[in-house]
Amino acid sequence: MRHRKAYRKLSKPTPQRKALLKALLISLFKHGKIVTTLPRAKEVTRIAEKLLTIAKEDSVHHRRLVYAWLQDRELVRKVFVDIAPKYKDRNGGYTRILKLGMRRGDAAEQAVIELV
């Protein structure tokens, strides 16, 4: 049974899963919107919400926490200077998931994640 499991495994070993989520996060913050499968979208949303909540308060410690996921100084600067200030008065709900339907090749459910 799947009771009290903290996250989705996405049918990948841990290092592969972390690399996938990191790549999706980087794309989300660079482009503001990405298309992926629904389970991946839900996992990326969880992490993106946490990172944006951290980024709302600018400090060296918070920048290091965000850098641990993004690994790109310019992108961290963009998150703290451009993206996070837009959400200063918002308590969560920084991302939106829109379902796109099934992918033609393998019938996987597609979704768009975008920053609100």
Curated annotation (Swiss-Prot):
Keywords: Ribonucleoprotein, Ribosomal protein. InterPro entries: Ribosomal_bL17 (IPR000456), Ribosomal_bL17_CS (IPR047859), Ribosomal_bL17_sf (IPR036373). GO terms for biological process: translation. SUPFAM superfamilies: Prokaryotic ribosomal protein L17. It comes from the Bacteria. Gene3D superfamilies: Ribosomal protein L17. GO terms for cellular component: cytosolic large ribosomal subunit. GO terms for molecular function: structural constituent of ribosome. Part of the 50S ribosomal subunit. Contacts protein L32. HAMAP family: Ribosomal_bL17 (MF_01368). NCBIfam families: L17. Belongs to the bacterial ribosomal protein bL17 family. This is Large ribosomal subunit protein bL17. It comes from Dictyoglomus thermophilum (strain ATCC 35947 / DSM 3960 / H-6-12).
